[in-house]
A protein has these predicted regions:
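Glycine-rich segments within core transmembrane alpha-helices of 12-TM secondary carriers
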Residues: 1-10, 200-213
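Extracytoplasmic gate region of multi-pass secondary transporters
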Residues: 10, 69-129, 179, 213
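C-terminal transmembrane helical hairpin of 12-TM major facilitator-type secondary transporters
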Residues: 114-120, 124-127, 131-185
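Paired intracellular helix-loop junctions of major facilitator superfamily
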Residues: 1, 185-196
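Helix-loop-helix hairpin linking two adjacent transmembrane segments in secondary transporters
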Residues: 2-48
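Juxtamembrane helix-start elements in MFS-like secondary transporters
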Residues: 104-113, 160, 164, 195, ...
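Intracellular helix-loop hinge segments at the cytoplasmic ends of transmembrane helices
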Residues: 14, 97, 183-189
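Flexible cytoplasmic inter-helical loops of multi-pass small-molecule transporters
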Residues: 44-63
Length: 217
């Protein structure tokens, strides 16, 4: 659902900016946000019974965090998700200005972002499946490497609509496909009792990387 929203959002935003200017566009987005907030009030999770081992039941919140940060693999996941946030926010924030600097039409950046949102659907689902067949840490290494490679190839390629489309498709397949293997690794190492907390810390570092990507880009 989020990917569909990311696919439609650039197209609708660009159209609204052309037709109604930014003030009216901002009002439309505020309406959608209020609607989403109103709907979220009714999304209460159902109570579920979680079967866990005795060790999981005895473990406290603080001991789970201490265990995680004493694990080398968890530290690498945190650092990897920092890079993840840096990469996707660098592209998502600065691709419009970059395309304009390269002399491309304003719609080229819109097409790239829309393609990223659309193909993220297939990338995320595909990576979730591959995570059941291959080692998740190897998949993550390949993903981050392909992301960096795709950005470098795009930057050093001559500006054209074809290259923009290829980049949008490629980066879309790699966009949030890091989430399934990362979440899976956390669950495999530490169990599911504090999965939300431990993955939340990983995602917090992702947001620090996102800040760096937006600010330094």
């Amino acid at each position: 659902a989020a990917s569909i929203g990311y696919f439609l959002s650039p197209l609708l935003t660009k159209y609204s900016l052309v037709e109604f200017e930014w003030e009216q566009t901002l009002k439309y987005f505020m309406i959608f946000i209020v609607i989403g907030l109103a709907v979220s009030i009714f999304l209460f999770p159902a109570k579920t019974v979680i079967n866990s081992s005795q060790a999981d039941r005895d473990q406290t919140f603080l001991s789970a965090i201490k265990e995680a940060f004493s694990h080398r693999g968890y530290i690498l996941l945190v650092l990897g998700f920092f890079v993840c946030g840096f990469q996707i926010t660098l592209v998502g924030t600065h691709i419009p200005g970059y395309m304009q600097d390269r002399g491309m039409a304003g719609w080229s950046a819109t097409i790239i972002l829309a393609l990223i949102g659309f193909f993220n659907i297939f990338g995320t689902l595909g990576m979730g499946y591959l995570g059941t067949k291959y080692k998740k840490k190897n998949l993550l290494s390949i993903l981050y490497s392909l992301r960096a490679l795709s950005i470098c190839v795009f930057i050093f390629s001559p500006p054209s609509m074809l290259n923009s489309i290829i980049f949008g498709i490629t980066f879309g397949l790699l966009w949030l496909s890091t989430v399934p293997p990362t979440n899976g690794i956390v669950a495999q190492i530490f169990g599911t009792k504090y999965l939300s907390t431990l993955f939340g810390i990983v995602f917090l570092c992702h947001q620090f990387g996102a800040f760096a990507g937006a600010f330094l880009g």
